[in-house]
A protein has these predicted regions:
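Catalytic cores and adjacent flexible loops of soluble metabolic enzymes
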Residues: 1-324
């Protein structure tokens, strides 16, 4: 199973790198546009945001719950979440800017109204957040919209991933991927368990499997690429020290650029598995490898045998493996 997001085909071997801007714009349209440009400049294949309708996804008690702290943008949790949303006009500017500079832009839709508005804006894909993996009515709604789904599997059991898989397939959707994810911020390397990617590959044959990382640093995501992640998603911020819920577990633009550089180097290093004598190795082999030479002077007519031969550099003549 492969599918396309913009010019990129997912599931063909090249890792699709998503810069998750999320709500790291802090509700500011100008910051959102800067994040798009930062993602493009870093070499990301796509940039992703989040869209939610807070009053639709929170109970009244949850909406009105006092929410004070260093990362709060409102006196209540609902007000905080509202403050982190972009306006319709800002969303149009986001999509227009992404199209203009040539980077696919999509979003996590946290409710059906958000999904509908994103489709109207022309998103080329949806992300299903880990928080909605068990929200199968929402998954069903998005799977019927004719664009690919990228589904995160954080804070879930395997049986719940099975349920999401069944719901997606029942709609006829065959363009989707699962991302292994650990929903702690930040995730410690010992928690990450990257081998789950192979578990998911075996359980859902043909489905592209990737990794959504919330760890600090680059090593875990680079390891995911080495283990064959079809997609890698990392949060992007302009400043890790900024106020907001996700900045501390995000990469700044230079960190994202270095991550993408290293992922591409890993892909190049993995190669095709054929063992060959490389053209670039031949001068080194000629200089350092060994050839068969006669150990001592022998008279004319002497018939050489193996006791007369030793291996010495350079390696430009008969190899010692032909000694006998």
């Amino acid at each position: 199973m492969t599918f396309r997001i913009g010019p990129h085909e997912i599931g063909t071997g090249r890792c699709f790198v998503v810069a998750e801007a999320g709500v790291n714009h802090n509700g500011n349209a100008g910051t959102a546009l800067l994040l798009i440009r930062a993602a493009k400049d870093a070499g990301a294949d796509a940039v992703k945001f989040q869209r939610r309708t807070p009053h639709a996804i929170l109970t009244r008690a949850a909406y009105d719950r006092p929410y004070e702290g260093p990362n709060s943008y409102g006196a209540t949790y609902g007000a905080h979440r509202e403050a982190l949303e972009l306006s319709d006009a800002a969303w149009r500017s986001v999509m227009d800017t992404a199209a203009k500079i040539g980077i696919p832009c999509f979003a996590s839709a946290w409710d059906e109204a958000s999904a509908d508005s994103l489709i109207a804006l022309g998103v080329p894909a949806f992300k299903v957040a880990s928080a909605d993996l068990t929200n199968t009515p929402l998954i069903d709604h998005m799977a019927r919209m004719g664009v690919p789904l990228i589904v995160s599997t954080g804070m879930s059991a395997l049986a719940e991933v099975d349920d999401a898989y069944a719901v997606i397939r029942a709609t006829g959707c065959d363009q989707f991927a699962f991302l292994h994810c650990v929903s702690t911020y930040p995730a410690e390397p010992a928690m990450v368990n990257l081998r789950v990617m192979e578990t998911l590959r075996q359980r859902y044959p043909g489905v592209p499997i990737g990794y959504s990382g919330h760890e600090t640093g680059l090593a875990v995501s680079i390891a995911a690429a080495a283990l064959g992640a079809a997609i890698i998603e990392r949060h992007l911020t302009l400043n890790r020290a900024a106020k907001g819920p996700d900045h501390a577990a995000s990469l700044e633009p230079d960190g994202l650029r270095r991550l993408i550089r290293d992922i591409r180097n890993v892909e190049a290093a993995l190669g095709d598995g054929r063992k060959l004598l490389l053209y670039s190795e031949r001068p080194v082999r000629a200089r350092l490898a060994k050839s068969l030479v006669v150990a001592h002077d022998r008279p004319a007519g002497h018939v050489l045998d193996v006791t007369d031969l030793v291996a010495k550099s350079p390696g430009s003549a008969i190899a010692p493996r032909y000694r006998s």
